[in-house]
């Protein structure tokens, strides 16, 4: 049975993503495969190429023939050179720089805005001792302010220029 290492297409229109699969040579492009040994995403920058080198070496050693696109990918990763015993087995695969974590980005933005990260919450928690003293002070204030508040209301005229007494007439 002739075995090929080929690409099976996944993804949406204009956004191809491929699996590198080992399959019978007579199966269709996206047909049943024997084993998936890697993946290839050409639209990412740089292109994502992941190949299980150990499995690729095994399938090449038992006679699996790579298709032209897979042969190019194997040369980029260095698996083809390793199989043939050629120099350059390390490959020339470009690797994307690692993305910074969201926590690092948040701390950097916070440092830029305020001068340094803080570990405190946005609203400080109310302490029980200070809240008890504030409640006692607030309770004393309305008692003292109540007689003063009643006098200005009686002296001020109601809306529309009418006195409060005229509203009691029937």
UniProtKB/Swiss-Prot annotation:
GO terms for cellular component: cytoplasm; small ribosomal subunit. Keywords: Ribonucleoprotein, Ribosomal protein. Residues 142-170 have a biased composition (Low complexity). Residues 114-170 are annotated as: Disordered. Pfam families: Ribosomal_S16. One of its GO terms (molecular function) is structural constituent of ribosome. InterPro entries: Ribosomal_bS16, Ribosomal_bS16_CS, Ribosomal_bS16_dom_sf. It comes from the Bacteria. The keyword Cytoplasm does not apply. GO terms for biological process: translation. The keyword Ribonucleoprotein applies. HAMAP family: Ribosomal_bS16 (MF_00385). NCBIfam families: PRK14520.1, S16. PANTHER family: 30S RIBOSOMAL PROTEIN S16, SMALL RIBOSOMAL SUBUNIT PROTEIN BS16M. Belongs to the bacterial ribosomal protein bS16 family. This is Small ribosomal subunit protein bS16. It comes from Mycobacterium avium (strain 104).
């Amino acid at each position: 049975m002739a075995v090929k290492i080929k690409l099976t297409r996944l993804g949406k229109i204009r956004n191809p993503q491929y699996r590198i699969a080992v399959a019978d040579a007579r199966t269709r492009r996206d047909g049943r495969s024997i084993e998936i040994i890697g993946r290839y995403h050409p639209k990412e920058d740089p292109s994502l190429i992941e190949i299980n080198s150990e499995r690729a070496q095994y399938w090449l050693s038992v006679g699996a023939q790579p298709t032209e696109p897979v042969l190019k990918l194997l040369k980029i990763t260095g698996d083809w050179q390793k199989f043939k015993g050629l120099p350059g087995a390390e490959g020339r695969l470009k690797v994307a720089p690692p993305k910074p974590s969201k926590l690092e980005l948040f701390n950097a933005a916070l440092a830029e805005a305020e001068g340094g990260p803080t570990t405190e919450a946005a609203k400080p928690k109310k302490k029980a001792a200070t809240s008890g003293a504030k409640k006692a002070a607030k309770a004393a204030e309305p008692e003292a302010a109540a007689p003063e508040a009643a006098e200005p209301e009686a002296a001020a005229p109601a809306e529309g220029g009418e006195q409060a007494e005229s509203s009691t007439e029937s």
